[in-house]
């Protein structure tokens, strides 16, 4: 029984620490996690800001997630060249998605989630 519990704990730890990339043509580390500056372009702009993920549009006034305005950001997935989200780096305390960008005052986002963050002021 002890070995099974230990194996399940290791499996859960492995699952929580891996970063999956579900966007087509993702480079190593994720589409928006490229820091070398080579072959990277700015992510496309949406109705009131910048696309952060396939369903996330953020600007100075906040973020829209899953709305009609943010649906244009899905086109970003069709481009094989990785893009760079403007904004300082921030850390989220979500399993698997720890590196994000400050995209709006008080908001830190990755390509699939956003969270309030005191470091993004």
From Swiss-Prot:
Q: What does the record say about tissue specificity?
A: Expressed by the venom duct.
Glycine amide modification, residue list: 29
Got any disulfides in this one, which pairs?
A: 21-26, 43-83, 46-57, 51-73, 58-63, 90-108, 102-120, 109-114
Secretion signal, residue range per the UniProt entry: 1-20
Which Pfam families does the record match to this protein? Hormone_4, Hormone_5
Q: Where, per the database record, does this protein carry 4-hydroxyproline? A: 27
- Mainly resides where? secreted
Cellular component aspect of the GO annotation: extracellular space; secretory granule
Q: Which residues form a coiled coil?
A: none
Q: Which UniProt keywords apply?
A: Amidation, Cleavage on pair of basic residues, Disulfide bond, Hydroxylation, Secreted, Signal, Toxin
MF term (GO), any? neurohypophyseal hormone activity
Entry-linked InterPro entries: Neurhyp_horm, Neurhyp_horm_dom_sf, Neurohypophysial_hormone_CS
Q: Where in the cell is it found?
A: Secreted
The written remark on domains in the entry is: The cysteine framework is C-C.
Protein family according to the UniProt entry: Belongs to the vasopressin/oxytocin family.
This one is known as: Conopressin-conophysin
The record lists the organism as: Conus bayani
């Amino acid at each position: 029984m002890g070995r099974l519990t230990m194996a399940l704990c290791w499996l859960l730890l492995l699952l929580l620490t891996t970063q999956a990339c579900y966007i087509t043509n993702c480079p190593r580390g994720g589409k928006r996690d490229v820091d070398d500056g080579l072959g990277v372009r700015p992510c496309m702009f949406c109705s009131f800001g910048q696309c952060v993920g396939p369903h996330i549009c953020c600007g100075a006034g906040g973020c829209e997630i899953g709305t009609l305005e943010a649906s244009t950001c899905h086109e970003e997935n069709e481009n094989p060249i990785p893009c760079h989200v403007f904004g300082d780096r921030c850390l989220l305390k979500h399993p698997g998605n720890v590196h994000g960008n400050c995209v709006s005052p008080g908001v830190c986002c990755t390509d699939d989630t956003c969270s309030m963050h005191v470091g993004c002021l």
